[in-house]
């Protein structure tokens, strides 16, 4: 079920950090700290450096996000 108050943006993974956390550079050159969503973790979807991903940002904190989709 999608939330109404999230902001969906696309970006590119630039750094992998511990505990399934990544630094993602958005299309507008901002860098966001992101974690993998629960469904992606449950289905063992792997994310590597350079992958294009879709993120969800909340309006409350625009420097943290959740990775919800990895483009092929």
Swiss-Prot record:
Main location group: cytoplasm
Stored PROSITE patterns: S1_IF1_TYPE (PS50832)
Q: Name one Pfam family in it.
A: eIF-1a
**Keywords associated with the record:** Cytoplasm, Initiation factor, Protein biosynthesis, RNA-binding, rRNA-binding
Q: Where in or outside the cell?
A: Cytoplasm
**GO MF annotation terms:** ribosome binding; rRNA binding; translation initiation factor activity
Residue intervals of the S1-like domain: 1-72
InterPro entries given in the database record: NA-bd_OB-fold, RNA-binding_domain_S1_IF1, S1_domain, TIF_IF1
Per the record, the domain of life is: Bacteria
Q: Which Gene Ontology terms of cellular component type are present?
A: cytosol
Describe its function. One of the essential components for the initiation of protein synthesis. Stabilizes the binding of IF-2 and IF-3 on the 30S subunit to which N-formylmethionyl-tRNA(fMet) subsequently binds. Helps modulate mRNA selection, yielding the 30S pre-initiation complex (PIC). Upon addition of the 50S ribosomal subunit IF-1, IF-2 and IF-3 are released leaving the mature 70S translation initiation complex.
Q: How does it assemble?
A: Component of the 30S ribosomal translation pre-initiation complex which assembles on the 30S ribosome in the order IF-2 and IF-3, IF-1 and N-formylmethionyl-tRNA(fMet); mRNA recruitment can occur at any time during PIC assembly.
In the record, the note on similarity to other proteins reads: Belongs to the IF-1 family.
Record-linked HAMAP family: IF_1 (MF_00075)
* Name used for this protein in its record: Translation initiation factor IF-1
Q: What is the lineage of its organism?
A: Bacteria, Pseudomonadati, Campylobacterota, Epsilonproteobacteria, Campylobacterales
């Amino acid at each position: 079920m999608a939330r109404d108050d999230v902001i969906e943006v696309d970006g590119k993974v630039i750094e992998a950090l511990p505990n399934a956390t990544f630094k993602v550079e958005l299309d507008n050159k901002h860098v966001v700290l992101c974690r993998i969503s629960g469904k992606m973790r449950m289905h063992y979807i792997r994310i590597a450096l350079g992958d294009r991903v879709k993120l969800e940002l909340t309006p409350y904190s625009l420097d943290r996000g959740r990775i919800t989709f990895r483009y092929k």
